[in-house]
Amino acid sequence: MNEGPNNGTDTYDYHLKTYGKDLVYDDFIRNFTASAWDPKEWVDLFADAGANYFVQVSKHHDGYTLFDLPENVTKRTSVALSPHRNLVKELFDASKKYQPHLHRAVYYSLPEWFHPDYKKYGFSIWPGGNATNPFINESLPYTGYVPLTDYVTDKIVPEMDTLAEMGTEIMWCDIGGPNRTTEFASAWFNKAAEQNRQVVMNARCGLPGDFDTPEYARYNGVQVRKWESNLGMDPFSYGYNRATPLASYLNASSIVTSLIDIISKNGNFLLDVGPTANGTIVDIEQQHLRQAGLWIKSHAEAIFNTTYWFVTPEEGENIRFTISPDAFYIHSLVKPSSTLTLSSPIPWVDGDSVTVVGGKMHGTVVPVHRLNNGSIALIVSKEVSAGDQYAWVFKIPY
C-alpha cells in the first residue's frame, strides 16, 4: 500500500471487485467487533491444548494496538476505535483468574508500516510514511494518528513500558530497527528481579535477547542457545484466512510430532491461531489443539522440564530423545513395529527397565535386549502399539 498502483496480484483484483477502489485498509477497523469474543474460552483452550504459556499480539505492523495507551501517544487502539475494548488486559485478567498456571506474554512490532513519524527511520519494507490508495494513487490518512516529536522515544518506549506494567513475562518483539531497548530492558529486568519474577526477551527487540525465533522453520540439530519455532496452524497465514481449506490446517499428529522434534533440539514451540473478526477461533483449530493437548498431558513427563540428549537428539527421521534429571526418553514419531532397534549410544545397561509413557498402556514394562552389534532392541507388543497415537514414548529411569 506504500507503493501505489499495483494491479498484478490476486489480492488487488479481489479487493477491487469485492470492495471497490474507495474502501481502504483502515476502513476495515470497524469490522473488527470482537462481538463473540470470550477471553475465558481462549485461555481454557490454551490450557486444554497443553500449553504452558501464550503470546498475544499487542501490536502488529499496521500500528493498531490491542491495549490502551495515553492519547498523546496514539489513538490507533482497540480502546479508542472498534471494538472499544482493552483486549490484552482482558485476556491477561482471564488467564490470572481461570488458568493462573499459564505464563502471559505479548508479541510487539517495533516499526509500523504507515506511521507518518516512522518515515525518518524507515527501511526495507517498513518505510514509514502515509500509505497510498493503490487504486487511485492518493495518500491516505493514518487513523488515530497523533503527531510525535520522535517515533522511538514517544511511541516505542511508552508502548513497551505499558506492556511491561501489564505484566508480560515475555517481550516477543518483531522486526527490530531503531530502538531504545537497552534502557527499557535494564529497567524491566531490574524491576522483575525486585518482584522475584522471571521475564525474558526474544532476539528481535534490538538486542541479542534470551532466545532465537526461526519462523515457519526449525533447526536440524541441537542449538545450545534456547530457541523457539513459531508457525501458524494455517500454513499460509498467521491471521484468519477464509480461503484456507480445512484439510490444510495443522492437525494434532503434526502438532505433537513437531513439538517432540523441536524440544529434542532445545527448542520451544509457539503455535499461532488466527481468530475471526468477531473474536472466535475456528472449530477445526480448536479440535486439533484439544486432540494434541490430550496427548501432551498424557506424556507430560517426557515433554516438560526435559532437555536435549547431549550425544544426539535423534536417530534417523523417526526417533527423538529427551532427558530429565530422573530419566531418558525415547520418542518414536511413527507407530513402532514389533521390534524398535536403536543403534545410538543411549544410557541403558543390562538389567535396566524400560516402560511405556502415556497412552492406554502407561507404565507397561517393555522387554529389552542388546544385539550382537551393540544396538538395543525394544520388543513392542501389539497392545503397546495400539495403545497410543501420534507418537510413542518409552522411558529408561535412572
Q: What are these model-predicted stretches?
A:
Residues 1-398:
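Mature catalytic domains of secreted/periplasmic carbohydrate-active enzymes
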